[in-house]
Amino acid sequence: MPAVSKGDGMRGLAVFISDIRNCKSKEAEIKRINKELANIRSKFKGDKALDGYSKKKYVCKLLFIFLLGHDIDFGHMEAVNLLSSNKYTEKQIGYLFISVLVNSNSELIRLINNAIKNDLASRNPTFMCLALHCIANVGSREMGEAFAADIPRILVAGDSMDSVKQSAALCLLRLYKASPDLVPMGEWTARVVHLLNDQHMGVVTAAVSLITCLCKKNPDDFKTCVSLAVSRLSRIVSSASTDLQDYTYYFVPAPWLSVKLLRLLQCYPPPEDAAVKGRLVECLETVLNKAQEPPKSKKVQHSNAKNAILFETISLIIHYDSEPNLLVRACNQLGQFLQHRETNLRYLALESMCTLASSEFSHEAVKTHIDTVINALKTERDVSVRQRAADLLYAMCDRSNAKQIVSEMLRYLETADYAIREEIVLKVAILAEKYAVDYSWYVDTILNLIRIAGDYVSEEVWYRVLQIVTNRDDVQGYAAKTVFEALQAPACHENMVKVGGYILGEFGNLIAGDPRSSPPVQFSLLHSKFHLCSVATRALLLSTYIKFINLFPETKATIQGVLRAGSQLRNADVELQQRAVEYLTLSSVASTDVLATVLEEMPPFPERESSILAKLKRKKGPGAGSALDDGRRDPSSNDINGGMEPTPSTVSTPSPSADLLGLRAAPPPAAPPASAGAGNLLVDVFDGPAAQPSLGPTPEEAFLSELEPPAPESPMALLADPAPAADPGPEDIGPPIPEADELLNKFVCKNNGVLFENQLLQIGVKSEFRQNLGRMYLFYGNKTSVQFQNFSPTVVHPGDLQTQLAVQTKRVAAQVDGGAQVQQVLNIECLRDFLTPPLLSVRFRYGGAPQALTLKLPVTINKFFQPTEMAAQDFFQRWKQLSLPQQEAQKIFKANHPMDAEVTKAKLLGFGSALLDNVDPNPENFVGAGIIQTKALQVGCLLRLEPNAQAQMYRLTLRTSKEPVSRHLCELLAQQF
Amino acid sequence: MIRFILIQNRAGKTRLAKWYMQFDDDEKQKLIEEVHAVVTVRDAKHTNFVEFRNFKIIYRRYAGLYFCICVDVNDNNLAYLEAIHNFVLNEYFHNVCELDLVFNFYKVYTVVDEMFLAGEIRETSQTKVLKQLLMLQSLE
């Protein structure tokens, strides 16, 4: 029954299309199109009124020309006219023209509202559907403003035809997604839920999508949908393959509707009502049982439809994560698919199993498939399947299989696609560290990584091995021996030279007893690589050499010779030259004792989190490492492998030598331990006391370096005020001045500026934040010529804030001379997330009269943002993970300032998140990511800002792992635009 | 949710483009070219799914035509794969060739709107869709 046939309807159109197809060249095509455009233009302009058919034909030709990629700048009015035609075919072409062209001409929308209104009111189901489809296809805010209120009524009206209900449900969905504020919730919502019971399966199919979307935002309003969805699902699942007639697809009853219902159920926790839950579990079991039955058809469509339901069922089982029996059955089912001949099924099984691996109930069951997965990694032809296999191996790894998995991944790395090498390297490094029983295995693994994929071993990975070796004396000798051997290779990667140089410089003495690795041999081995290395590596090696002079006095003459050589002392690179000069002098002037102190072994690194894990999280979004962090399936791992932390005493009472080495503020994991450390070392040696932490007011210049995060155990210890300012009780201070909020808002996206000014006093702020710490300078300027007396600024923590934010202040002079400025330093530590800023109360006497002023201190939670770069894919994955309704906060608001993209960018950066390019498909939108660092916890935040220049509105969406934070950030940021 | 539907031939000519989210015209052109590039290099041993930007493409090839649906990453792959087949299978298209899609481009949109709307599956029953399309065809 060829219902679609050539030339059916408009002959002129068919002729025109044929002509275009016959054009031999692009030029000929353009010529033909221009001729046609001229023809149509003259027809539209002519005196003779065109009949509906001609109008339809010409508009359709214009549409065809547009779809060929040419601009259309006329004909819109004719298209709009077609909407008021009584003939379906004319109306349809009019609507189609508008739906397709509307992007390029939004003026059009205003012109058609009337026609749509008429069609919606026409009671003619065909016309109503055309109008609804047009609204759904355009989906703009203007459409929402005009129609959002009408559509719920059409949807639930008793006399609406089924097809109209279907279209109305999805039309409403589109409007709700575009502008949720425009769709009024009301009594219709209850009736929408009951559409799940509708006799017409098409209506149910459309309604489920609408309900799924609505319930994500308003879970409580829609929770009755759970039991209705369960009973609907149960009826479908238990029906025979022919019961549903029209809705049976290759012997599978209503596959798409089943999938949609299962997805709806994933918006909610398992049903509380035992009867409902029992019925649901029965459904899930039936689906799993059916998967074992022989297929009713050999066609792939049959098995695809069946498996679509099966995979969605498994998703729901994983979502509930509460039925061990079902989880294990799901796992066994997926295990069968791992060896299926269909690539699609193998791919989906690997993907699905990855989530099963993180459930404590099914982790063991997943592990039994390890050989199959390893085989997939080796043999699959499609790279995306291999990628899934690698993901799954990572997810199923624990202490029992770590060695096998790591060695397989290493083997895979040799042939892995370039695009995924870095990720594999990170994964191997993390697994090796996490599950190392003896650290020699860990060291071997990392050195293998460098050997196999040196270019893909990022700084984090080789810093990490140095940190671990430094912190664990049981592995130092082995590490020295192994790097020494690795360096024997004729060609070794520069990263190997770096690791080797650092380790031998620290622990070379542990293998010096063996004549095969005597000090001169070690030195000449390293030095043989020197000339081929980059400046950074050579700088590191020079530091190794000076350490050698301390470790092995017998190498002193040789090394001094190397340092003295013209190629070092007069090196064009300033860093190398400086090191050579200073190390040479140091080795000549310093006594053995001094040398031994200065060049002592590095103290253990303070440890919070593996820097590699942080990097993988940055790559994959903050949730990526969660399966690993989560120690529940391997509780012993924390005891052994978490033992990386140094004993607190090492850090909180820094020994003089540690201080001398510039380690009192241990470099953050990401800072190069060697180059930065060595750089500081020199400065500290020659400047002596100046490098001690100064307790007095710090010079501005030292501000940043002073803020290097101190050891976590006692973050404030070094900065502590000898006399912490006593907080006056809240009753002692007045309420904040009325404009305090406004003043605070000015500082949400910036750190410096004038906080307050009146005729007497100006208060300036300069602040700097790093991780969960901040330092703020307040400058109080006396604008008068009279001295202020009893001047006392204090910081007050209202409510719970005391437990959330620690602020230490230094006292300032009680007198401020006329025209003078005093400075106050505040050290701030964010302990956990907080919502209200601390208050700053300033009191003084001016000319005998007491003055008091209370302001809000510009410390808001976003100051502790650490920007996080991530790729688009990771962003969206993470975004999806934060899909619980309470994790999201959204605001739609009018622009208060001109909408300038550059200004917006600057504000978002000032807000503290990273701005991610090429993430949002719409380049007008802004997308950001960051982690709020507090002492107690980290909160990952994702944000998206969608400007609508036409409406002068913004929509701001924040998703964080913590509900109040989402809301608070959303409010803070919304006030900035 | 479906982000867009594309029907392309092997040469990359677009036979249908249906968008369910806002893109400007340049972006649409870029997407069309990218989809063509990622889909045409794949063979029968590959999956019918390709990661694509922040989404994924579910595609199926019928003779010289590629039917591609771009959906969210957590959408059900097989359900959309069969949705393509359900769409193509429609009696309304019985024995239809690429050329018919060209000449009747304005009707194809109607079929799409019957089966997919607002990026969601609207109707899956072959019988119901066909009945509706025949009814519309009988209208003037």
Curated annotation (Swiss-Prot), chain A:
Q: Just give the chief location class.
A: membrane
List the expressing tissues. Expressed in the brain (at protein level). Isoform A: Expressed in forebrain, skeletal muscle, spinal cord, cerebellum, salivary gland, heart and colon. Isoform B: Widely expressed in tissues and also in breast cancer and in prostate carcinoma cells.
Disulfide linkages recorded for this protein, renumbered to the chain, are: none
Low complexity bias (residue ranges): 646-665
State the compartments where it is located. Cell membrane; Membrane, Coated pit
Q: Matching Pfam families, A to Z?
A: Adaptin_N, Alpha_adaptin_C, Alpha_adaptinC2
Bilayer topology reads: Peripheral membrane protein
Q: How does it assemble?
A: Adaptor protein complex 2 (AP-2) is a heterotetramer composed of two large adaptins (alpha-type subunit AP2A1 or AP2A2 and beta-type subunit AP2B1), a medium adaptin (mu-type subunit AP2M1) and a small adaptin (sigma-type subunit AP2S1). Interacts with SGIP1. Interacts with HIP1 and RAB11FIP2. Interacts with SLC12A5. Interacts with clathrin. Interacts with RFTN1. Interacts with KIAA1107. Interacts with PICALM. Together with AP2B1 and AP2M1, it interacts with ADAM10; this interaction facilitates ADAM10 endocytosis from the plasma membrane during long-term potentiation in hippocampal neurons.
Q: What is this protein called?
A: AP-2 complex subunit alpha-1
Q: Which organism is it from?
A: Homo sapiens (Human)
